[in-house]
From Swiss-Prot:
GO terms for molecular function: DNA ligase (NAD+) activity; metal ion binding. NCBIfam families: dnlj, PRK07956.1. The keyword DNA damage applies. The lineage of its organism: Bacteria, Bacillati, Actinomycetota, Actinomycetes, Mycobacteriales. Belongs to the NAD-dependent DNA ligase family. LigA subfamily. It catalyses: NAD(+) + (deoxyribonucleotide)n-3'-hydroxyl + 5'-phospho-(deoxyribonucleotide)m = (deoxyribonucleotide)n+m + AMP + beta-nicotinamide D-nucleotide. It comes from Mycolicibacterium vanbaalenii (strain DSM 7251 / JCM 13017 / BCRC 16820 / KCTC 9966 / NRRL B-24157 / PYR-1) (Mycobacterium vanbaalenii). Zn(2+) binds at C433, C436, C452, C458. The gene is ligA. DNA ligase that catalyzes the formation of phosphodiester linkages between 5'-phosphoryl and 3'-hydroxyl groups in double-stranded DNA using NAD as a coenzyme and as the energy source for the reaction. It is essential for DNA replication and repair of damaged DNA. This is DNA ligase. Residues 622-707 form the BRCT domain. The active site is at K135. Transmembrane segments: none annotated. SMART domains: BRCT (SM00292), LIGANc (SM00532).
Amino acid sequence: MSSKATQDPEAVLAEQSDDATEAGLRRQWQELADEVRDHQFRYYVRDAPIITDAEFDAMLRRLEALEEAHPELRTPDSPTQLVGGAGFATDFTAAEHLERMLSLDNVFTPDELAAWAARIRTEIGADAQYLCELKIDGVALSLVYRDGRLERGATRGDGRTGEDVTLNARTIEDVPEKLTGTEEFPLPSVLEVRGEVFFRIADFEDLNAGLVAEGKPPFANPRNSAAGSLRQKNPAVTARRRLRMICHGLGHIEDAAGFPFRTLHDAYRALQAWGLPVSPHTAQVTGLDAVTERIAYWGEHRHDVEHEIDGVVVKVDEVALQRRLGATSRAPRWAVAYKYPPEEAQTKLLDIRVNVGRTGRVTPFAYMEPVKIAGSTVGLATLHNGSEVKRKGVLIGDTVVIRKAGDVIPEVLGPVVDLRDGSEREFVMPTHCPECGTELAPAKEGDADIRCPNSRTCPAQLRERVFHVAGRGAFDIEGLGYEAAIALLQARVITDEGDLFTLTADDLLRTDLFTTKAGELSANGKRLLTNLGKAKAQPLWRVLVALSIRHVGPTAARALATEFGSLDAIVAASEEELAAVEGVGPTIAAAVTDWFTVDWHRTIVDKWRAAGVRMADERDASIERTLDGLSIVVTGSLTGYSRDEAKEAIIARGGKAAGSVSKKTAYVVAGDSPGSKYDKAIELGVPVLDEDGFRRLLENGPDTPDS
């Protein structure tokens, strides 16, 4: 799709007789530029053009002619100034929600549901009318429409601020670019709508089948793959993933009549009339008994739905009652999610095989007849180690019971002994590495795990380490996936992960993966080199994670990076100094110290340093040290912070993120399900903050938070 020809500017001017004011010209240019960009998006990202190339060329020529006649209209991001699909990339900038995007409280038993309904009845003095809808196991998305046109799509984030994923949202089939009002439901000037993005089970299975056919590892489950697909930097990848969306709520509305709906059910009718997707399985019911019937029904028919569900959401339907009931800092009081228990199924254990991980750990896994469970097909499950296999008492050939804990992770519970026919056989852990032949042994006496000690050259450990370097929790290098790791090692382009940051175009041309049929470097190869260059500036904690030091994940790495500030300082620290860091302890400290005693480990660090990888963090002077000297304990789940993020925020402001409550504790921050630390704080009289109080404490220090 390209055009360089121009039209006679006089012809353009002749068409502007009724629209020649400056504002009119700007409006005309904006409408035409938007239309061109829309068709470019359909062509380059969605691969689904709706006009011919000739029609597009004519449209682009009209825009070029308009800009030539009125150069002041031309902007740097005009379609005439960009090549092809340039500009269609998602950079995940912060996007503030117009209205807070709350979470939901969960209940897991009929008694807990009844207690919630009783609180509602006590508050309103009667049985409420409820709206029951399926709880889709997907990822939340907020859309903003202004004057009927899609303006922005954003993830939930911390409820106040999410990530801008507008380009990716536009690729979802169910997300309309433009809404159409009706006589019954006129469009508000601004509409913020919330929904769930998901994979239909059939689409998820097709996606995984395609990945397996390409020699790539399949996704674990539909929810995680939906979240990953929505967060792709290249929206064209998202477009190929066949994501779907269902709307289940409203945020901010700007309308002459205020919030124009009496019930949530009416709001859903309006959304559907405007062209937005809503669930066909929503039901209005009155009283707890009717709610319980809906929950029981969908518990039995959950696999009759095209997508995965993990419960039923129950909402008070009348908007006036919703406002009366209000919300906590994290969830509305007028809604609750009834979560179904994890599912179990029986299947045949065909074999037990082993996998060698990046730190040499040899893990047995169950290879089973595929079985449907929790809406997806399961054929593999971990067995952790040889001792666990013996403890569970499973034999190869057994019929076994498997469960998806939390409807996500497959787990072998044990055998159905009564179904044994004598053909079953015991699994024996290998004595030598299946990849390199080295004799296996525990890292130390008493360990349940056995490991391959050939950490430097074992092919399995090498490719897992190279792949790990690129992971989201490490350097986060797009383009360096499992297939790329194998290709680079097999072509001997790299000997280990230490060579990654000195890769050149000539190096990549030695692999088929990054070479075109014409013998040139592929687009993926160029992208990999660019992303490797960017990764050199990643913060220190990511470098630590990428080194594959045993026990050092993002939590410990952040703690060490925050405490010491540079890799040299970490190497120079004693084991006791490392262990004293909050969140580290003696086991991790010993692992870090031991790792740096190995010559080839230090060589990897030296190679990265020589290639320009950042080995020290610059302290952010813009963050005020509002918590200097304060010991703060975080307990329970926070909506806006992961546990690591909360600790990082405390440490960055000069505080200590303590793991236990004592008389020296300045504050305890209590989220959802806080546990014994909350009780200890009450017993000792330590001030307790909710999440809003914690946020004020971070911003202003100890003088202003309210518990």
